[in-house]
């Protein structure tokens, strides 16, 4: 891997930050998901620049951006497309839906019925759509950012655990600081700077392939697995007091995504090998939405993040000598 390959990520962030103030965590996670071929579930109140963040990111890579506002009257055909009868020709023509884009914002995904949510999640997983007898692949790269409003829950359709598990990351977005909000108001009430394209979609796909080559030491895989299995059996890690708070822990998909996301984060940070800190930094965003908490946790006002922070503190951080990392990379690249 060329060490300079991390620099396009820096230029991309620079361009996005011309428009977006703050939200560094969300922006970094967007890039990680894009490089790791994952999708993001974002939870936050309206007005925190979620739409603008992904739209600006699309501009920086020369990709196509589309937004779907999820509502109770939405049907799957509104997402994936349908076949329309042409009276002039007497034939059916296929009209592709808005999921055929590079970056898709699924706004307030929990406001649409389960069959619509399932249609989107199927596209996310399969990266293709079948309409009639024809199958159409979505463009590459393809990233879905789905949002949920944590305040308004009346009239919503909560995502089932099996579907939430399909998202690589769940990111919590909070309010900006006073200083950041001042800059936001100042910037949004004047002419915005133009965002320059720093990559093509083809170059981004090439970078995804470079991320696949980032070396992950077996001890880091063991570290990730221990984190995830601790959510299923906290008593095995000296955390028996957490057992009654967790009904179901994270699935093996969490371990897989933790390695994929940690590898992409290492690439963003300019390395061709992952460190324990990369795995640790991604742990909350990868695991938090995969926990099913008990009623006791809800009654005691205990959140998934509270439990995860205790688990992460208990799992010992492995030491990976730099010499072993270099040897591993040489073997891998041989």
Predicted feature locations:
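Walker B catalytic acidic pair
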Residues: 44, 107-108, 119
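C-terminal engagement/docking regions of AAA+ P-loop ATPases
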Residues: 1, 236-334
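Conserved C-terminal "switch" segment of AAA+ ATPases
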Residues: 2-6, 19-20, 156, 170-241, ...
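Conserved alpha-helical scaffold flanking the Walker A/P-loop in AAA+ ATPase domains
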Residues: 29-32, 85-105
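Pre-Walker A (pre-P-loop) alpha-helix and adjacent loop at the N terminus of AAA/AAA+ ATPase modules
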Residues: 5-48
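Walker A/P-loop
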Residues: 34-71
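Canonical AAA+ ATPase core
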Residues: 86-91, 108, 112-116, 124-214, ...
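Conserved beta-strand position immediately N-terminal to the Walker
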Residues: 40, 104, 142
């Amino acid at each position: 891997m060329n060490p300079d390959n991390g620099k396009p990520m820096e230029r991309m962030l620079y361009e996005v930050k011309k428009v977006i103030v703050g939200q560094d965590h969300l922006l970094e996670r967007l890039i990680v998901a894009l490089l790791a071929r994952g999708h993001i579930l974002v939870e936050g109140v309206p007005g925190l620049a979620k739409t603008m963040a992904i739209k600006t990111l699309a501009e920086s890579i020369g990709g196509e951006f589309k937004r779907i506002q999820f509502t109770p009257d939405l049907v799957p055909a509104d997402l994936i497309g349908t076949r329309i009868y042409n009276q002039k020709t007497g034939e059916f023509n296929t009209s592709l839906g808005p999921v055929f884009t590079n970056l898709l914002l699924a706004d307030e995904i929990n406001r649409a019925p389960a069959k619509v949510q399932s249609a989107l999640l199927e596209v996310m997983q399969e990266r293709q759509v079948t309409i009639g007898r024809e199958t159409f692949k979505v463009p590459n790269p393809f990233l879905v950012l789905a949002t949920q409003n944590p305040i308004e829950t009346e009239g919503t359709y909560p995502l089932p655990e099996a579907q939430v598990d399909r998202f690589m990351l769940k990111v919590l977005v909070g309010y900006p600081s006073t200083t950041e909000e001042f800059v936001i108001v100042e910037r949004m009430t004047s002419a915005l700077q133009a965002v320059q394209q720093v990559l093509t979609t083809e170059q981004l796909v090439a970078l995804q392939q470079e991320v696949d080559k980032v070396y992950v030491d077996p001890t880091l895989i063991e570290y990730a697995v221990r984190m995830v299995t601790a959510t299923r059996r906290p008593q095995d890690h000296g955390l028996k007091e957490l057992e009654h708070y967790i009904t179901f822990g994270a699935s093996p998909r969490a371990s897989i995504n933790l390695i994929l996301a940690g590898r992409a984060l290492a690439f963003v940070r300019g390395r061709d090998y992952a460190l324990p800190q990369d795995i640790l930094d991604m742990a909350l965003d990868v695991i938090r939405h995969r926990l099913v908490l008990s009623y006791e946790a809800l009654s005691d006002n205990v959140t998934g993040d509270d439990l995860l922070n205790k688990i992460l503190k208990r799992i010992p951080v492995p030491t990976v000598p730099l010499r072993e990392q270099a040897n591993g990379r040489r073997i891998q690249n041989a």
